[in-house]
Amino acid sequence: MPRDETPEREHAEQQSRQALEEEVRELRRRVEEAPSRVRALEEKLLEVSGALAQTQAKNEKLTFTLQQAREHIQNLREEVEKLTQPPSAYGVYLAANQDGTADVFTTGRKMRVAVHPEIDLAAVRVGQEVVLNESFAIVSVRGSDVIGEVATVKDVLDDGSRVILLGRADEERVAQVAGHLQHPPLRVGDSVMVDPRSAMVLERLPRPEVSELALEEVPDITYHDIGGLDRQIEEIQDAVELPFLYRELFGDYRLPAPKGILLYGPPGCGKTLIAKAVANSLAKKVEQVSGRSVRSYFLNVKGPELLNKYVGETERQIRLIFQRAREKAEEGVPVIVFFDEMDSLFRTRGSGISSDMESTVVPQLLAEIDGVEALRNVIVIGASNREDLIDPAILRPGRLDVKIKIERPDEQAAREIFARYLTPEVPIDAGEVTTLGGGDAEKAIAVMIERTVERMYATSDENRFLEVTYQNGEKEILYFKDFSSGAMIENIVRRAKKLAIKREIAGGSRGICLDDLLASIAKEFKEHEDLPNTTNPDDWAKISGRKGERIVFMRILLHEEEGQTGGRAIERVATGQYL
């Protein structure tokens, strides 16, 4: 190798070595700087990731806002469409046609309109309200209208689908009956609501005046609840129950059932109780004989409330009551129409002072009882404490056939009435049970009742009540027993029970004792010292059940020992409670 090439080679190697060393140093520097660069890149990656997440959240928020805006715009469009739609008309459904159309009454005229496919006309009733669109097609079905005019059914036409109505000023018109009112059909006299535009009867209205006056409830009173009236109960059973229980036997003898019964007598002696017990007992007896469940109907007519200031209203209500009774009787069940305070409605014609109302009311009742339309399975029972005021035509045979006097209770009847209220279920004082009954509560009650009745019916000076002077100059002493009644006996027992309750509350003994009953009698007599007050002596005598010579003067004997010896003319004082 030439000598001159050696330095050049060494120089080249040196340069190459330097370059390699430089490259090594660069690589070492890069290796040393790599972790910091990695950390920087990681930090930058985190920043970019956070920015991306923020951008995504913004995008989601913008998307949600955009969706809300779209929905709001859609709602606004729907509202605008609703506001710009033409109004829907209402109509009354009349009938369906074979071609799928329907007849409706709307805007004062009858129209044949199309029906939306989703509406089933078979389920739509006549008289229902329908909604029509701008093309007068039925798009919806509603219930019947709830407002209209009130009218009264005068007559029922066809099969009950049409009726003749009486409206304002007795104007008559023919109207169609809505489908839901045709079964059961309307009856003559029913109060209904009618749509005057379509002449459609939409609703049957209750008649409060008739519903309140004639109650169809069957009372739960039995003959066992009535004490001291065994003879009267037997008479009314013979008159009412036998004709219904043995129809064939009565038919063999050609003996018609009585049409009516009059229960008369002083107030508070059980007239209304007997009438209630009749309805209850009659249904049970008929059920036993026939073997089928029978419900009797008791139409309780409150006499004074039937009176009406408008001419003909009282007569109309009497007709409605008997019409209802006939409808119930057609089912083959007994119906009792009970007129309480009968003298207030059916007074003797011509006896009115300020009106002649009775001149039309009495004939209406007579026509209902034995007119052209015979009463079958219907019994009229009247109750009154002034039977002398009732028109004689009502009391004649063939109308109110049976007349039963409900008298004031005697001593035996009083014992039976007391026994209805003083029963072993009522707490009795333990001392009385031991002393009077020897440990037997029922025996103690019997002794208490016996002594109470003896005190109540004694004709001693402490029981003297009135001295009455008759027109012929005779005088008579009346005792409290002459004015006793079942209501008075019930009130005495109530007072005794109240005394026992107050004594037990105060820490005393429990139960009723004899002293409670005796104290109650004294208090009852004390409170009724003004019992005979009346403006007319004859009225007092008749209502109290004492008939005969006219009473012209009376004086109270209850407090005579206290210096009140003077009498008082009864014309100067007000009407009393019981008499």
UniProtKB/Swiss-Prot annotation:
Residues 1-21 are annotated as: Disordered. InterPro entries: AAA+_ATPase, AAA_ATPase_domain, ATPase_AAA_core, ATPase_AAA_CS, NA-bd_OB-fold, P-loop_NTPase, Prot_ATP_ID_OB_2nd, Prot_ATP_ID_OB_N. GO terms for molecular function: ATP binding; ATP hydrolysis activity. ATP binds at residues 268-273. Pathway: Protein degradation; proteasomal Pup-dependent pathway. One of its GO terms (biological process) is modification-dependent protein catabolic process. One of its GO terms (cellular component) is proteasome complex. Residues 8-86 form a coiled coil. Residues 578-579 are annotated as: Docks into pockets in the proteasome alpha-ring. Keywords: ATP-binding, Chaperone, Coiled coil, Nucleotide-binding, Proteasome. ATPase which is responsible for recognizing, binding, unfolding and translocation of pupylated proteins into the bacterial 20S proteasome core particle. May be essential for opening the gate of the 20S proteasome via an interaction with its C-terminus, thereby allowing substrate entry and access to the site of proteolysis. Thus, the C-termini of the proteasomal ATPase may function like a 'key in a lock' to induce gate opening and therefore regulate proteolysis. Consists of three main regions, an N-terminal coiled-coil domain that binds to protein Pup and functions as a docking station, an interdomain involved in ARC hexamerization, and a C-terminal ATPase domain of the AAA type. Homohexamer. Assembles into a hexameric ring structure that caps the 20S proteasome core. Strongly interacts with the prokaryotic ubiquitin-like protein Pup through a hydrophobic interface; the interacting region of ARC lies in its N-terminal coiled-coil domain. There is one Pup binding site per ARC hexamer ring. Upon ATP-binding, the C-terminus of ARC interacts with the alpha-rings of the proteasome core, possibly by binding to the intersubunit pockets. NCBIfam families: pup_AAA. Belongs to the AAA ATPase family. This is Proteasome-associated ATPase. It comes from Acidimicrobium ferrooxidans (strain DSM 10331 / JCM 15462 / NBRC 103882 / ICP).
